[in-house]
C-alpha cells in the first residue's frame, strides 16, 4: 500500500478536504460539491437553488432496477448551460453597444442522442437556438426536430448532391438552412441544385484562417486544415456565385479554431482575421448578416484555469466579451453593419450535464516485500542493502534509491560470475524491493520528483477493477489522452489512504484509467479508499457529456450502459424523465451480425446430443437452456 504523501500528517479529515483534494471546488463549480455526509452533491441549476445527493440518487435508481454502470443525464444542467451561454453574450452585447444579437447552434455530433437534442431544441426555443449538422444523417435529425422557422440549421461537412438538395428543400418546410461551403468543389453542386430545384439555400463559406492554434486540435486551422477555403478559393467562390446570380444568398462566414480553445489569445487572433474577412466579403457585394465563430469554447476539466490541454485561461464571459468587442471593432470603422453572432459551442453546452457512475469490483496491489532475517556470514552486498533499508528517511530518498539500485545491480553481476548463491540473490532482491517500498511511502508529490523516482509510486500502487469499458464510456481517455475528473462519490468524509488507478473489464492493456487531473497537469495515480467487505465503492466520471456517448465502441462486446434523464421536481427531489436501457448480450451479438435465435438453436441441438449420449438429463438440459436464454437478455456488464 502506498500512502498519499499530502495526507500523511492530516489528522482531522473533512469532506471539504476531499473537495480540495479532488479539485471539486474548481472544475465542479457551480454544479458539483460535497455535502456534510461526504457524498457528492449535484446542483443542477447551479447557484439558482435545488440539489441532489448523488449517492441517494444512485440508490433510488438501483431500486428501479437500473444497475451500474449508469449514465445520469441532468436535464436542468443542460438548460442552465444554455442560459449561461446566452446570458454571457447578452451582457457583452449590452456592455459594448453591439448592434446585433447572438444566436447559437448545437453541433449534433457532440451528442446525437434523441432526448438530448430534443431537450436542447425545446429549452433553446426562446432564443431561437438552432442545430448544426455535419452529415446527411445528422441533417435528417435536425430537420425533424428543429421546427422553429427563426432558428438556424447550419449545414457543415462534406456534401454530395443529395445533402445539398435536402438542405434546399428544407426551406419548403419552414426551416432556415445555411449550406456552408467547405470545399471548392461544392460550389458548382450548389449552383446546379439551386437551378434544378428553382430555389436556393442561404449560403455560407468557411475560411481557412492563417491564425495558428495550439493543443491537440490545432490542426483545425491553417493551410493544412481539413475543411475551409483558402483566400484564392474564397474569392473564386464569390465570383462563381455572382455569375450564377446567387451572391445575394451568401449570408454567413464561418471559421473554426479547434474543439477546445485553451488560450484566449488564439481566439483573439482568429476573430481579428475573420472580422476583416467578413468586412471584405460585405464590400464585395455579399449581403452577409451572420458570423459563425465555430466551436472551441472550452471546458476547464482540471479546474486550473490555465492554457493547458485540459483547461482554459478564460471564462465564459471573457469569451463572449472578446467575440463581441473584436467583431464590433472590425465592422463599425468600415461602415459595415455588425453581423448576428453564431457559435457552435457543443462541448461547453453538453460536457457538464452527464455523470457516469460505476462500481469497483475488487482491488489488488503489490504485497509489502518481506524482509529476510539477518544471519551470520551474509554476503557484503546483502549487508549493504540491509543497511540502506535501515537508513532510509525523508532527507535521503534520492541517495537511498541510488544505493539500492547499485547494490541490486552488483548482486546480479556477482550471481552471474558465481560469487553469489541463489539464496543470497533472493535475499538481495527482497531487500531491494523493501527499499523501494520504503522510499515510495515517503515520496512527495509527483511534480516534485526527479524522473527516476516517478515510477516508484506506480510500482506499489493498487489497481481497482472497474465495472465499465473505457472504450465504450470514455473513449477519449484512450484515444487522445483526454483528462476527465474522476473521484469517489461517497466516503469523502474519510481520508483516502491509497494511491491507485482503474482497470476496466476489457481484455486490453489499454483499458484503463491511469491519468488523473492535477492542477495544470496530469498524475498517474488517484487518491482512493481501501475497499470494505460487503460495501460498494462508487466512482464518478464527470464532464463527459460531449462526444463520449456517441464515440464509444463495442470492444470485447461491452455495450452501452443504462442511461437516465433526471430533472429536479417541484413536488419532490427529482423526477426520472427518460430511461434508456443499456444494450443486452443479445443486442451486441446482433450488432456483430450474430443471430441470437440461431445461436440458441445450435446450443439446443448440442444439449439434445448430450441427452442422447447420457451426459445430460432432460431436466438439466432445460435448466441449461433457461440459463442461456436469460443470459442473452442480461446486461453486458457484471452484475452486483
Curated annotation (Swiss-Prot):
Task: Name any Gene Ontology BP term.
Answer: spermidine biosynthetic process
Pfam families given for it?
A: Arg_decarb_HB (PF17810), Arg_decarbox_C (PF17944), Orn_Arg_deC_N (PF02784)
Question: What Gene Ontology terms describe what this protein does at the molecular function level?
Answer: arginine decarboxylase activity; metal ion binding
Pathway(s) of this molecule: Amine and polyamine biosynthesis; agmatine biosynthesis; agmatine from L-arginine: step 1/1
What InterPro entries does the record point to?
Answer: Ala_racemase/Decarboxylase_C, Arg_decarb_HB, Arg_decarbox_C, Arg_decrbxlase, De-COase2_CS, De-COase2_N, De-COase2_pyr-phos_BS, Orn/DAP/Arg_de-COase
Enzyme Commission numbers on file: 4.1.1.19
Which reaction does this chain catalyze? L-arginine + H(+) = agmatine + CO2
Q: What class of enzyme is it?
A: lyase
According to the UniProt record, list the residues that bear N6-(pyridoxal phosphate)lysine. Answer: 109
| SUPFAM superfamilies (UniProt xref) | Alanine racemase C-terminal domain-like, PLP-binding barrel
Gene3D superfamilies from the UniProt entry = 1.10.287.3440, 1.20.58.930, Alanine racemase (3.20.20.10), Lyase, Ornithine Decarboxylase, Chain A, domain 1 (2.40.37.10)
State whether keyword Magnesium applies.
Answer: yes
* Disulphide connectivity of cysteines: none
Q: Which domain of life is it from?
A: Bacteria
The prosthetic group or cofactor this protein requires is: Mg(2+); pyridoxal 5'-phosphate
UniProt keyword terms in alphabetical order: Decarboxylase, Lyase, Magnesium, Metal-binding, Polyamine biosynthesis, Pyridoxal phosphate, Spermidine biosynthesis
Where is substrate annotated to bind? 291-301
Protein family (similarity comment): Belongs to the Orn/Lys/Arg decarboxylase class-II family. SpeA subfamily.
| Function comment | Catalyzes the biosynthesis of agmatine from arginine.
| Name of the protein this chain belongs to | Biosynthetic arginine decarboxylase
